[in-house]
Amino acid sequence: MSGHRFSELLNGTKPDFLETLFNSLENGVYFLDRDKRIIFWNRGAELISGYPAAEVIGKHCSDKLLVHVDDKGIVQCKDFCPADRTFKSETVFPGTAYILHKEGYRLPVNVSAFPVFDTAGRPVACGQVFIDYSPRILMPQNLQELERMSLLDLGTQVANRQFLELHLQSRLTEMKRFKLPFGVIFIDVDNMAKLNERHGREVGDRVLRMIAKTLASNVRFFDAAGRWDREEFLVAVLNISEAKLDMVSNKLRLLISQSHVSLEAEFISCTVSMGATLARREDTFESLVTRAEQLMLHSKWLGRNRVSSSFKGAK
C-alpha cells in the first residue's frame, strides 16, 4: 500500500485509533512538540522507563527524566539530542543510548526519532521509539530460578556471592579446557560510609540497588553481575580481550556515575572504583578475585572513580 493511500485510510479511522495502536505496542513510544515537551507517552514507555504518563506529560524529556547518555557517559540532551537532529534534518534519526529509569539506574535502548509533519509539510512534532535491549528481558525467570536455589541477593535482586563463586569456578574450568578467555571486574562504591552517615542506611540501600540494576542491565545475557559483599560487586565478562575489558569496565563506571536516586529535595549519585583483570591459565578462584580486588584498591589509592587494569596506572 502506498504512503498516500495509507494516509487516506488513516484519515477515515476513529480519532483515538493511533493512541490505541501505540498503546498496544511493547516498545516505548512518545511524542515531543517543537519545544521538546512530552505530549504523548504510551504504555510501553511506562513499562520500560517506570514513569507513568501522568508524571511526564507536559515536561521536557531532559527534566531529570530519561536524560539520554552515550556509552562514554556524555549527556545527549544538549549537543546530541535526537529530537533536535530530527527537527533539523527532517529525517529519521536512529541510534543507541542509555536512559534513566525511574528507580535511578541506566538502561540500554535502541532509539529511533522521526519527524511529524503538518498538512503544509512543516515538522511540528518529533516521535521517538525506544526498545529495551538489556538482559533484564530474561530476568524474571532467571531471578525466580536464582531465588529458588538461594543464589539471589534479596537486597539488590542480583546474583549473590555464592552464585558468583560457582560461576567463576565454571569459567576457569572452561578457560583451561577450551581456552575461552574471560575477565573479572571488582567494584567498590566510593565513600559509601559517608553516604550512609549523611542520608541514612535506607537511602544507601537504594543506591546499592541502583548500582546493581545498572550493572545487570548493561552486561550481555551470558555475562554475570552480582553482589560480592556489602558495598562490593563483581562482574564476569566472557570471551573478551584486555582492551575490550577496559572499555566495558569504563562504560559501566560512567553509567553508574550518571545514575541517581531521587529524594524529595535532591538527587543522590555516587561513583565506583574498579579493578579489571583477565583470567590466567595458572589462576585459581582465589588468586583471580584477589588480583581484581587489589587492582580496585589501586584505583582507590589513585583517587577513586576509575578503573585499574595494572598497577602501573589507571585507565
Question: Which ranges hold each PLM region?
Answer:
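A short pre-motif secondary-structure segment
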Residues: 224-227, 268
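PAS/PAS-like sensory domain cap-loop motif
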Residues: 34, 43-60
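Signal-transducing coiled-coil linker helices
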Residues: 9-12, 16-27, 105-155, 162-173, ...
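Catalytic-core segments of nucleotide cyclases and related cyclic-nucleotide turnover enzymes
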Residues: 246, 264, 278-315
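Conserved long alpha-helical elements within nucleotide-processing catalytic cores of c-di-GMP signaling
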Residues: 160-183, 190-217, 226-230, 234-235, ...
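Conserved hydrophobic beta-strand signature of PAS-family and PAS-like sensory domains
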Residues: 38-39
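PAS and PAS-like sensory/regulatory domains
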Residues: 93-95, 102, 107-111, 268-273
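Terminal output helix/cap of sensory domains in signal transduction proteins
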Residues: 64-103
